[in-house]
Amino acid sequence: IAPMIHVHTAITIFITFTHLIYIFGYLWTKVTIFAFMKTYTSNHIVFFSPTHTSAKIARAIGESIGMGRRIEIDLTTDENSSPIEIKDSITIIAVPVYAGRVAPIALQRLRRLKGNNAPAILVAVYGNRDYEDALVELRDETIQLGFTPLAAGAFIGEHSYSRPNMPIAEGRPDVTDLQIAEQFGKDCLTKLEKDETLSDFYLKGNIPYRFVGPSTPAAPVCTEGCFACGECIEVCPTHAIALSDEGKIETEITKCIKCCACVKECPNGARVFDTPYTPMLHQKCAARREPELFI
């Protein structure tokens, strides 16, 4: 009888131990999931946005996501090279499209970021022509920087070459665009809550990326209405504009990226950029285009 009692006791102990392991495993899983969900209590809004269109979209997405803490990183005029660590934060990264690609200087400044596997919502803003391979390029770059792409969107912003008499996507992003951006942010958050592994998603674009050759150096100029207030100096992303010893505004043409921030921000309307692309884009890109989202 004694051996049978010992066997029964051993079986009971084994079953109890196995049950405890199961309970511990279950509780650990719950704790892990809870910890995962609690990890994202902040969001970073990162943008390069000379004429503020990318910033508007990024902020609309960020505000709809919420979170207890929101941190903005404006790389537009920041030439600092020190690394920026982002950890445990939903990150919105918004950049302008130049000739179907991410603006080169935007890519250059994004390379300061260290993603640490943070989920990233990628945004390309273009002037109503086409974004072509910009989102694919942005995705590849952010993966290299350590981010995990969560979703992506192509939005429309008023073209840098738009003029009052020849508008190109004038006033974009508008109220409708911002509403779409807000809903996009909410949809991204829903995906994050349901899909912890952040599965891949379809993205429009090509590899290799669209070839973009060197552009002819050109820059906006000042008219007689300029009174050297210096506003253009402050907003230039490449610091290509300076005040001469004679008190005149001068532009280093080889540094200009033709973003036309100086044109749009001049309080006296005294900064102009004449380019044959303005009438061409005004004519060919008149039809309204809508945001395209990939989740």
Which positions does each model-derived feature cover?
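Extreme N-terminal basic, low-complexity initiation segments
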Residues: I1-I15
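Short hydrophobic alpha-helical segments enriched in small aliphatic residues
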Residues: V7-T9, L20-G25, A35
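FMN-binding flavodoxin-like domain, especially the glycine-rich phosphate-binding loop
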Residues: T32-H44, S49-T76, S81-S215, D274-I295
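A mid-sequence, solvent-exposed acidic-amphipathic segment
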Residues: D200-P237
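Iron-sulfur cluster-binding cysteine motifs and their immediate structural context
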Residues: C222, F227-E252, A261-T278
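Short microdomains enriched in Cys/His and/or Lys/Arg
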Residues: E250-P267, L281-I295
